Amino acid sequence: MGCCTLGLFADSVEKRAAKDVFTEPARFYPSQKSTLESARSDTSESENASSSVPSHSQQELAPDSAAPARNSVLSPAPPERREKQGTAVHGAEVTRAGAVSPRFVGGLTKILAASDHTFFAAGNDGFLTQYTYPDYKPDTWQITPVSIKHCAVHPDRARIAVYETDGRNYHRVSVWNWRTKEILFAKRFTASVVSLSWIVQGSFLSVGTASREGVTVLDGSGNTVSLFSEEPGVVLLTASGPRLVLSYAESGRLTYVDYSKKTTVKRLLTEKNLLSPMLIHNGAHLVGYRDQRVYVIQSSSGAVLTEYPARSACFAHTFSDSLPVWIEPAELKYHWRIRKAAQRSADFMLPDNARITSACSVRTRVIVGTDRGILYELQQGDDRRVTIRALNGERQIYASDVHGADEGAYFLADGSLYHSMASGGPYRVLVRGVKGTRFLPYRDGFIVWSAGKETEFLHCAQKTSQHRMIYRARSTVSGVSVYGRMLVITEPFSGVSVVDIERGIRVFFHKAIGMQDSLLITDDVIVATQSGLQPLVLLHMRTGETYTQRWEAICLGVRAHDTQHVYFFSLDTNAGTTDLIHFVCNCSNPQKVLCDASSLIRMRI
């Protein structure tokens, strides 16, 4: 949904006719020192307390000076040096950019122009990447583990607001300093966010939500401010000029608000339920899609100026373009075309039958994102043929588990165990064909298992790459540790097992429900945590005795520095604190195991 900086609202709309509201040329009103920046030092504590960041949000920046409306795409471009190799794909030549960045896993969700030579791309994998024309050098940062759906670039170009969601009940908007990769503030919402835009020269952030209120306005510190005197409905687009704020709601209501007086200046009714509404022609026209038609509406009156038949519309125009530009599917399956009003390019097809999910314009090019996570640069020639260049696509490896090594680290990904040097450089494969998602280093190989139910524990030898089954768990595994040649396995619905790795035989089993984690600290003594009033317990393998330790908190995880020093997290729900506890075990007298316990770190929860 659209957002932009609008500089052509009339100075005194109440005294002018509706047809004169948008007669002034567009101007970009540079942001003064934003309230966001000035409030940051005063509100750093509250910002840090707020937790982590993302559909269609239009270009934030208008030209720095008055300029007539123009079209930035579908015009002949100056010749540039390109890679000679290419593959013709149904009327399109596909080449690859020199600087290649990884693809977005799960697909692209949003492309947003930040200036006439830079743009942001966001994906379902939580990655946000800034690309700079003409080499498209990427600057990438993962700001969330969930999907990014909306973005809005601040007029100072240093800050970006994003909406992140898991598609169910997690909805959060956060603002980031892109240059330092620091979060400035974040706010959770109970309903999904449908639009995101900076208004009033970047002083406020407008968040349109699918709630009864319809829109929430935040100041530079993330605090809610009152801007609308009445609920405008579900707001799909918000823009502002030097004095007025314009909002478009899905009900078709156009509302003008004087933000200095917080009063409604004018209300209009126009086409309702427009998808991806955006402003063009320096704010004079509102563009949106509905029912196989692209509508061009006069912003000052709400009147429909033009309708264009369209099979669908993924808009790619800029704020100053005089005509709408969009990508639509062609008649043939997996084929696409570029539209500029009634004009159309030759049909083209993307590799891998990719589906276009987002688009924007940079200089004379159209940048599109796909459901395969690949970005493409589209350029139309005089013959209407479209030249295609892939901007990313390197394969990424996602590690399911990582452990430190003497030099570098081991990690497990895509069924293989790798080693990466601390100095960087290429990683090397140690063991292939691994069936599991978790592992522990063990002597000349690794112990591998999966986090699911009834998992097999395998010993994978590094030199021979042979896999040998050690043990099969009967229920979900919550904790695994190695002591010498003994493997300690904790199953919450079964108990604690100790398995001889070399022989593949279980040598000890403590049957109990609610075990959380366990650690063998001597040849005979196991320290374990369990749910209940006495969460800390010692198990003696040789005698079979159990020693419960009174602890007025919940114990989470146990780890040992050596055979005597044990660490665990203690969660006190009454006091609202979490402590990292260190204690020295007196294994000759297990009943005095907590004779030396101290809190190393205390965290308030």
Curated annotation (Swiss-Prot):
Gene3D superfamilies found in the cross-reference section: YVTN repeat-like/Quinoprotein amine dehydrogenase
InterPro entries reported in the protein's UniProt record: Haem_d1_sf (IPR011048), WD40/YVTN_repeat-like_dom_sf (IPR015943)
Region (Disordered): 22-93
Start-end of Low complexity biased regions: 46-57
Segments passing through the bilayer: none
Record's protein name: Uncharacterized protein TP_0598
Organism: Treponema pallidum (strain Nichols)
